[in-house]
Each structure stands twice: as structure tokens, then as C-alpha cells.
């Protein structure tokens, strides 16, 4: 656990980081992207080696490969969701990813694959609310779309089509029309109002303690949760 490994991770590779620290203006950089990850990119080391990624030595999180690969795909001329999908599709493991590109400031990209994580897209007034469970959505809206990381769009080609890619457009924030969805192989998965779920939980069901938001409660609980995880596994 370190500041260098904190999320979001950026697409800046080692040479760019060194120039920035020296006060210089980087030359010939790739498009700037950022990403956050919940889950594990099991083959991140293999991807870094295969693509000859120049990662800062102090950054050891598997999440770093996401924005770097995405930036490289954009630099190769791939556009929009195609670049994002090509970056995340080779990643093995169960992942929930959110990414942002400076070239498209009004868009947010999401990816979900596997059963270990979840992503909910809340439809609020003029806003999308992204959370890993309904508790993170219902404070702002009771309506949401749940991404599906397991069901293949083509059962005959399950491995390539399992998982979903989503692009959120700020121009239609909070509306179904602002959500574009594809399977991992690029097959479009149209949305309609029938995909929208009304939450069965409300803010009354959320135990926030004295915290104003559930996220702050989770952050506050982190030390005790960490201690409980280690309990019985370490010797004095």
C-alpha cells in the first residue's frame, strides 16, 4: 500500500514521470488516460512484458497496465470504445474498471468481466452514479442498470463475448440514452427502459453510523477490516 499505487492510475510511463519530476515538459507523449480497478488483472506482468511497457519502478499495482495500454491503443489511432475494449479484452481475471480519457472529457468508460465484482449505473437527475453495490446508488436515485460480467452475448463464443463494456455520455447524463453498451467482442448490446431496475433497498437500510456517506464509512472501517483479515494468520 503506497501513494504510488493509489487509484486512479494514469497512463504516464517511466520516462514521462521522470521528466515531470525534473520540471521539464514531456515531448511526444501518448494520450492521457486514467483508470481505477476493483479486482485483479491476473496477467498484468505478462501484458507489461509483451507490450514493453515502461512502468515507474515504484508502481507495482496491476491497475497501472489499464491506462497505459488504453493510451497506447489511442496513440495507434483506435477511437472511442474500440481503443478501450482492445486494451481491457486481453486482461485475465475478474475485473471492474472505470476509465477516463482527457481526449474525451465528457465520457466515462466502464468494463466488467467475471463474477467477483459488480457495477451499478445509477440514473439520477442529470447525473450517472457508479457504484459496486446498490447501497452506493440509492442515496442519489432508486433507478439503476446493473452490468453483467458473466453472461456471454454469443454462447457459441462464450470466452470472447463474456463481459460488458459501457460508455457513459455526459450530454445525456442520467438517461438510458446516455448509456452505450457492448460485449467484450464489440457486439452492440442496446439498452431500453426494460433494463432499468428499481432498487428494493433505501437509505434507511444503510448503516452509515455517524458518516454522511457510505463510502466514508467504508474508508473509516478499513483499518479494522484489515486487522480482522490478518487475525489468526500472523504470529507475534
Question: What are the language-model segments listed below?
Answer:
Residues 1-236:
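Conserved short alpha-helical segments that host acidic/polar catalytic motifs at enzyme active sites
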Amino acid at each position: 500500500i503506497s501513494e504510488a499505487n493509489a487509484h486512479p492510475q494514469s497512463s504516464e510511463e517511466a520516462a514521462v514521470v521522470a521528466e515531470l519530476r525534473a520540471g521539464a515538459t514531456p515531448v511526444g507523449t501518448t494520450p492521457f488516460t486514467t483508470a481505477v480497478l476493483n479486482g485483479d488483472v491476473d496477467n498484468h506482468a505478462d501484458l507489461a512484458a509483451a507490450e514493453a511497457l515502461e512502468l515507474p519502478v515504484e508502481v507495482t499495482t496491476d491497475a497501472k497496465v489499464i491506462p497505459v495500454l488504453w493510451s497506447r491503443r489511442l496513440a495507434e489511432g483506435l477511437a472511442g470504445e474500440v481503443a478501450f475494449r482492445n486494451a481491457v479484452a486481453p486482461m485475465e481475471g475478474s475485473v471492474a474498471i472505470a476509465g477516463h480519457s482527457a481526449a474525451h472529457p465528457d465520457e466515462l468508460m466502464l468494463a466488467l468481466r467475471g463474477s467477483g465484482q459488480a457495477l451499478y449505473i445509477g440514473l439520477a437527475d442529470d447525473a450517472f452514479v457508479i457504484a459496486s453495490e446498490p447501497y452506493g446508488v440509492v442515496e442519489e436515485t432508486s433507478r439503476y442498470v446493473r452490468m453483467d460480467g458473466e453472461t456471454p452475448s454469443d454462447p457459441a463464443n462464450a470466452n470472447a463475448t463474456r463481459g460488458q463494456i459501457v460508455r457513459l455520455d455526459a450530454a445525456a447524463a442520467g438517461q438510458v440514452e446516455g448509456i452505450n453498451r457492448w460485449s467484450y467482442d464489440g457486439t452492440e448490446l442496446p439498452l431500453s427502459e426494460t433494463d432499468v431496475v428499481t432498487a428494493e433497498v433505501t437509505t434507511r437500510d444503510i448503516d452509515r453510523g455517524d458518516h454522511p456517506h457510505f463510502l466514508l464509512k467504508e474508508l473509516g472501517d478499513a483499518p479494522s477490516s484489515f486487522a480482522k483479515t490478518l487475525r489468526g494468520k500472523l504470529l507475534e
